[in-house]
Amino acid sequence: MADDRKAALDAALKKIEKSYGKGSIMKLGEKIDQQISTIPSGSLALDVALGVGGYPRGRIIEVYGPESSGKTTVALHAIAEVQKNGGTAAFIDAEHALDPQYAQKLGVNIDELLLSQPDTGEQGLEIADALVSSGAVDIVVVDSVAALVPRAEIDGEMGDSHVGLQARLMSQALRKLSGSINKTKTIAIFINQIREKVGVMFGNPEITPGGRALKFYATIRLEVRRAEQLKQGTDIVGNRTKIKVVKNKVAPPFKIAEVDVMYGLGISQEGELLDMAVEKDIVDKSGAWYSYKEDRIGQGRENAKIYMANHPEMMAEVSALVRAAYGIGEEVAVPEDEKGQEELPLVEE
């Protein structure tokens, strides 16, 4: 009896593979690629918070938060990392607000970046689907879900009501996209805004536009919020930003990465490296002074950051120790053009 059942199952499996191709059905233990393949996020602190060393390939990621919190910056750093590793990136700019000069400063190769500025939400999502289905693009960023306006809304009058139209559009698109994203191992990052429900007395009134579909389909959801302003003297030079992993299907969620987002420069690698090195006792902090081995590297956090920026060899050494302490892969070597760069001035305390 058992042999008959096994023979029937084998026949069914062969029939399925013949109809839908090899790999369409298999035993879970036989799956070839069980190890999660990732790309770095561009932030060491965020790589640690994500739990797997970066963004998992073939998954959907949602990045949301208030205005000017650093959502697009987070996505552009991911694009820069993909390009550094020889991959192809696409940016669907539904907001029509991408600054190419800022993207370039973050390390994005704008000559190779595929850019689309769609007229309607349907057009933007169809372009995303075509790019993902090609299998030739490693990362697609949609900025933003809230700006994906359905065609009916654009063609209609200004005061017309279109209840649930955008939510239906996103639900339909994600049903179609999720399979091809997984099959082609493309990373899809959807940037989203936040809105507030009217009349909520208890609990969090904040919601994200585009319905619930994206929340369900996303493997990772990142909440990006400004914590405080960073100043040099009286000048505001950036923001201390908290990135909270509110959903994570590949590692434990609710971890927080704190980074410095500097105006015009993006995430400060020196700042996060310094904080992580202090946490793991690689760099010693005594009062206001920071020391590495026998050398004092700065009085105050800003001066220690500047010292690290001016000494890339030491920074690479600290980076290797921090990565080993957190169990993250090796960092790339320091570029030659950074070794001879002009030193930054220290900050007056």
Curated annotation (Swiss-Prot):
Its main location: cytoplasm. This is Protein RecA. The keyword Secreted does not apply. CDD domains: RecA. Belongs to the RecA family. It is found in: Cytoplasm. GO terms for molecular function: ATP binding; ATP hydrolysis activity; ATP-dependent DNA damage sensor activity; damaged DNA binding; single-stranded DNA binding. The keyword Nuclease does not apply. SMART domains: AAA. Keywords: ATP-binding, Cytoplasm, DNA damage, DNA recombination, DNA repair, DNA-binding, Nucleotide-binding, SOS response. Can catalyze the hydrolysis of ATP in the presence of single-stranded DNA, the ATP-dependent uptake of single-stranded DNA by duplex DNA, and the ATP-dependent hybridization of homologous single-stranded DNAs. It interacts with LexA causing its activation and leading to its autocatalytic cleavage. InterPro entries: AAA+_ATPase, DNA_recomb/repair_RecA, DNA_recomb/repair_RecA_CS, P-loop_NTPase, RecA-like_C, RecA-like_N, RecA_ATP-bd, RecA_C_sf. The lineage of its organism: Bacteria, Bacillati, Bacillota, Bacilli, Lactobacillales. The gene is recA. GO terms for cellular component: cytosol. It comes from Enterococcus faecium (Streptococcus faecium).
